[in-house]
């Protein structure tokens, strides 16, 4: 059995792995604005960095929103497509060995997939908040989408200056909610908030939806 390459062409990143009889090999993430550029760049870098010959590859499987743009061979290799939600469900089942679970896939946005009995897989919903939200707000409010820079700024910020917390509206904890839990994201933000405080609020959005 040769290697099967799996590629998830997402909205902001492309993820790629190889699978052979020994298991999963060399996961890689490549970022690019254009999904086609990201796909071909990720695949070329993957096989080069890992010393993989095209002759070693039996199949290339594509998924993700960006894979819809691909309807031709990849470096001469035929490609097959699979549903992203099915891939998420099967992958989580394989990795966890659980028969019944809810899979939360946090990418550019966030989706929820239900797995029943290890084989019945269905998409049950999602929210339009994810990594793309963090990047977009950072571009608008901080004039950068460099996540490392945003995190450094957030470490110096004070979230209490940005988010309305339970303690701001109630003097006792609510069941399951500590006083420092966020009641309203950016609910206390003022026009003179520091950039560091704003960064803390943006990062908190991601944390609040984990």
Q: How would you describe each model-predicted region?
A:
Residues 2-8, 59-61, 101-105, 126:
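Short glycine-aspartate micro-motif
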Residues 3-41, 45, 121:
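Short glycine-rich, Thr/Ser-proximal phosphate-binding strand/loop in the N-terminal lobe
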Residues 8-13, 65, 104-109, 128-131:
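A short acidic Gly-Thr/Ser loop motif
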Residues 30, 78, 120-127, 135-140, ...:
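Flexible, glycine/proline-enriched loop segments at strand-loop-helix junctions
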Residues 43-58, 200, 209:
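Phosphate/pyrophosphate-binding loops at sites that engage ATP/ADP/AMP, CoA/4′-phosphopantetheine
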Residues 70-104, 109-119:
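Conserved phosphate-binding catalytic cores of ATP/NTP-utilizing and phosphoryl-transfer enzymes
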Residues 139-207:
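Active-site rim beta-loop-alpha module in soluble metabolic enzymes
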């Amino acid at each position: 059995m040769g290697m099967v390459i799996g590629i998830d062409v997402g909205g902001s990143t492309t993820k790629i792995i190889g699978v052979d009889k020994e298991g999963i090999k060399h996961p890689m993430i490549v970022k690019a604005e254009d999904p086609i550029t990201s796909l071909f760049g990720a695949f070329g870098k993957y096989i080069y960095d890992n010393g993989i010959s095209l002759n070693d590859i039996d199949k290339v499987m594509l998924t993700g929103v960006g894979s819809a743009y691909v309807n031709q061979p990849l470096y001469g290799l035929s490609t097959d497509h699979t549903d992203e939600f099915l891939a998420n469900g099967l992958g989580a089942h394989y990795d966890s060995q659980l028969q019944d679970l809810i899979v939360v896939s946090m990418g550019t946005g966030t989706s929820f997939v239900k797995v029943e009995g290890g084989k019945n897989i269905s998409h049950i919903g999602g929210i339009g908040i994810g990594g793309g939200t963090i990047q977009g707000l950072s571009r608008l409010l901080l004039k950068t989408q460099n996540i490392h820079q945003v995190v450094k700024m957030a470490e110096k910020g004070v979230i209490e200056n940005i988010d309305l917390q339970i303690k701001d509206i109630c003097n006792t904890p609510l069941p399951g909610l500590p006083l420092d839990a966020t009641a309203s994201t950016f609910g206390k933000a003022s026009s003179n908030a520091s950039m560091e405080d704003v960064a803390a609020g943006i990062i908190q959005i991601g944390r609040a939806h984990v």
